[in-house]
Structure formats: structure tokens, C-alpha cells
């Protein structure tokens, strides 16, 4: 295999060709930095967190594929992944995970000790998550914690503390993550049942749409509370209204529980997060 072919395999293993996960991680992280800074965050901190999100999302994908390497070949959506298809060895994948993990850790070493301490917890959570699908019916709830961990880290980096406002934002993102990752799990539900993978899509059963709606409502409530604690105004409120519109659209998409529309609903959350982040930023800059 040529160097170019090997690089392509590494890029696909790290999902660099599919940025949706990176974006879903990025928006709440940037919102946390903006809230914490009371406007535009420190440029150095901003750059470190953007790079860190990209690298840690890649790490998460690698360790996820390593954990699922014997199962992915039985799932339609994942059977072509590099580890499942045999394009890359388990040792190579773990080596790449280690290198990227060390690089991510080197980034936080440029920040304060509290961020470093929180980052260690974040790495541990990232490693544990893929294995929760074997032992619990609620891996999406664990993922909510993993994908929200950048929020207290962002506050710690910007202010040196993690105030109550940060935990409301954490709760908002946790609920939102459970909602959209359950939509994602609905795509694989039939295959997951065959191979023994657990998910909230399976756990919720015929009440999946209603429970997703409840998590969306909880996320919105927490986003509103975080905004109120930060003294946000009308533009942020418009972002909240847009977020509601996206949630309603997603509910319409998942109504029939078909794979294609459920996946489209999952992808639509990128736009919901982006619009809310832009609204928050404009609210600080204009008002």
C-alpha cells in the first residue's frame, strides 16, 4: 500500500472525510467559550479548542472502531470501515490513537492546571464510551457526558473556574446529544439488534419519538436558563426559536422511523447548533 493510500485509510479511520461529528462537538464548545468570555474568547484559547475538538473527535472515532472491530462487519453502515474491512491492523489503529491523544494533551498543557485536570477525565471518558454499548442500554447518555466535557474545560480555560452557568450549558448539550444520537441509533436499530449492540433507540422502543422530543425540550429549557444567567437578549432568543424550528423539523423526519430520514434528522442538528452559536455571538457583539 502506497503512502497516499495509507494516509487515506488513516483519514477515513479518523472520520476526517465525515466532519459532522466534529461540527456537533464544535458548536457547544464555541458557545461555552463565548459565554465564558462574555463575547469573543481569547484567540489562543479559541485556536487550541478548535484544534482540540478536531483531534479528540478523531481519537473518539478510532477507539470506537477498535472496540467495534468485530461487530462493524455485520452492520450495513459500518462494514466498510478500515478496521472492519481489514485495511488497517488493530495495532496501527491503537498507535494512531496514542499519537493523536498525546498531541491533544500537549495542546491543553498550554493552558491552566484546571483545564489539564479536566482533560484527563475527558480522555478517560473517551476511551470508556465505545465499550458501554456492550453493557448498557443507554450508551447515548454516556456519550452525552463525553461530548459535553469540552464545556467545563472551555470555562476553565477562559476564566479559571467552572460556574453554575457552565453546568446548565452542560445539561443542555447532554440532553441535545442524547436526542440526536438516538436519531442516529434509529438508523442502525435493526442491525444492532442482530449483533447485540445496545442503544437508547432500542431501549425506548415505540416511544422513541416522544422521548426524543422530551430530551429536545429539556435541552431547550437548559439553553434558555444558561442564556438568562448570562443576561442574553433578543438575538439569542431568536436563536432559541430557530432551534425549536429545527427540532420540529427533525420530529417530522423521524416520524416514519425510516433509515434515510432518521439520518437526515441527525445531520440537521449541525445547522441547529451552528445557528444557535451564531445567534449567541451576535447577541454579544450587537447588544
UniProtKB/Swiss-Prot annotation:
The keyword Magnesium applies. GO terms for biological process: ubiquinone biosynthetic process. It is an enzyme of class 2 (transferase). Pathway: Cofactor biosynthesis; ubiquinone biosynthesis. Its cofactor is Mg(2+). It comes from Shewanella halifaxensis (strain HAW-EB4). Belongs to the UbiA prenyltransferase family. This is 4-hydroxybenzoate octaprenyltransferase. It catalyses: all-trans-octaprenyl diphosphate + 4-hydroxybenzoate = 4-hydroxy-3-(all-trans-octaprenyl)benzoate + diphosphate.
Amino acid at each position: 500500500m502506497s503512502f497516499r493510500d495509507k494516509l487515506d485509510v488513516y483519514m477515513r479511520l479518523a472520520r476526517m472525510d465525515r466532519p459532522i461529528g466534529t461540527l456537533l462537538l464544535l458548536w457547544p464548545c464555541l458557545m461555552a467559550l463565548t459565554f465564558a468570555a462574555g463575547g469573543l474568547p481569547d484567540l489562543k484559547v479559541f485556536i487550541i479548542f478548535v484544534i482540540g475538538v478536531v483531534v479528540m473527535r478523531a481519537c473518539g472515532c478510532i477507539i470506537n472502531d477498535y472496540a467495534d472491530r468485530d461487530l462493524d462487519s455485520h452492520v450495513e453502515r459500518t462494514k466498510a470501515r478500515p478496521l472492519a474491512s481489514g485495511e488497517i491492523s488493530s495495532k496501527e489503529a491503537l498507535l494512531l490513537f496514542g499519537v493523536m491523544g498525546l498531541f491533544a494533551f500537549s495542546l491543553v498543557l498550554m493552558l491552566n492546571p484546571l483545564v489539564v485536570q479536566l482533560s484527563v477525565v475527558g480522555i478517560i471518558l473517551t476511551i470508556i464510551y465505545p465499550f458501554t454499548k456492550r453493557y448498557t442500554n443507554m450508551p447515548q447518555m454516556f456519550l452525552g457526558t463525553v461530548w459535553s466535557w469540552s464545556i467545563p474545560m472551555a470555562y476553565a480555560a477562559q476564566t479559571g473556574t467552572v460556574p453554575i452557568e457552565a453546568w446548565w450549558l452542560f445539561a443542555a448539550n447532554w440532553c441535545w446529544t442524547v436526542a440526536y444520537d438516538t436519531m442516529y441509533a434509529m438508523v442502525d436499530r435493526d442491525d444492532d439488534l442482530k449483533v447485540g449492540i445496545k442503544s437508547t433507540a432500542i431501549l425506548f422502543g415505540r416511544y422513541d419519538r416522544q422521548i426524543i422530543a422530551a430530551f429536545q425540550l429539556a435541552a431547550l429549557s437548559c439553553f434558555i436558563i444558561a442564556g438568562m444567567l448570562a443576561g442574553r437578549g433578543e438575538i439569542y432568543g431568536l436563536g432559541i426559536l430557530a432551534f425549536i424550528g429545527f427540532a420540529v423539523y427533525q420530529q417530522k423526519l423521524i416520524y416514519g422511523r425510516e433509515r434515510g430520514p432518521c439520518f437526515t434528522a441527525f445531520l440537521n442538528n449541525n445547522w441547529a447548533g451552528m445557528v444557535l452559536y451564531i445567534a449567541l455571538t451576535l447577541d454579544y457583539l450587537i447588544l
